Amino acid sequence: MTIVDAKFLQSAQSVNDSPAPNVAEVAFLGRSNVGKSSILNSLTSRNGLAKSSSTPGKTQLINYFEIKFKTKNEETPYLFARFVDLPGFGYAKVAKSLKAEWNKNLTGYLQLRPNLQIFVHLIDSRHPELEIDKNVDEFLKEIKRGDQIIVNAFTKIDKLNSSELSKLKRDYPDGIFLSNLKKRGIIDLQDKITGYLFGN
């Protein structure tokens, strides 16, 4: 199964002004500068689809993208889902500050969106043990429903040497390992998403 089309749908400030929850959604979240926009663009083969903005306020919006998948089934040749680009979170060091870092609306989206199926937590492979990422992982595990999964995807692996990458893979055997620069792991992430959403 491959992505054949991707387009920006809308931005929203909260779950209340989000699109109708009638299509499965995949949420991408991670620290600021983790490479989230680049990964989204590589996944969809659409340069500039997701844009990292330096404009204050822009980064606080939830951005929705409609994704069209081509199947191998003649009866159902296309399937649809949404990728959701969430605001990057900052560098808070205390667990209690997590919900303050993310505004109330973002937390509401993560907890209340009924069609949200996959959390893709993007983590900088050079700093896999940061407290903020551990806090996010714990938070997601707390709110995760039985029909949802968390995917830990490690970005910028081209910055690691071979022994560092081997250790990372040992430490996180279920992780996805990505290099946007060298386009490594992109298909692995796509397969993980489509396998869970559509069973293939």
Curated annotation (Swiss-Prot):
User: Which residues does the UniProt record annotate as the domain EngB-type G?
Assistant: 22-199
Instruction: Enumerate the SUPFAM superfamilies for this protein.
Output: P-loop containing nucleoside triphosphate hydrolases (SSF52540)
Extract one GO molecular function annotation from the record: GTP binding
Which residues are listed for Mg(2+) binding in this entry? S37, T59
Task: Check the record and name the InterPro entries matching this protein.
Answer: G_ENGB_dom (IPR030393), GTP-bd (IPR006073), GTP-bd_ribosome_bio_YsxC (IPR019987), P-loop_NTPase (IPR027417)
> Which Gene3D superfamilies would you find in this protein's record?
P-loop containing nucleotide triphosphate hydrolases
User: Could you tell me the keywords of this UniProt record?
Assistant: Cell cycle, Cell division, GTP-binding, Magnesium, Metal-binding, Nucleotide-binding, Septation
GO cellular-component terms in the record? Answer: cytosol
Residues annotated for GTP binding in this entry: 30-37, 57-61, 85-88, 155-158, 177-180
Q: Which cofactor does it need?
A: Mg(2+)
Give a GO biological-process term. division septum assembly
> What does the sequence similarity comment in the record state about its family?
Belongs to the TRAFAC class TrmE-Era-EngA-EngB-Septin-like GTPase superfamily. EngB GTPase family.
Q: What does this protein do?
A: Necessary for normal cell division and for the maintenance of normal septation.
Q: What HAMAP family is this protein classified in? A: GTPase_EngB (MF_00321)
Q: What is this protein called?
A: Probable GTP-binding protein EngB
Supply the source organism for this entry. Answer: Aliarcobacter butzleri (strain RM4018)
User: What is the gene name?
Assistant: engB
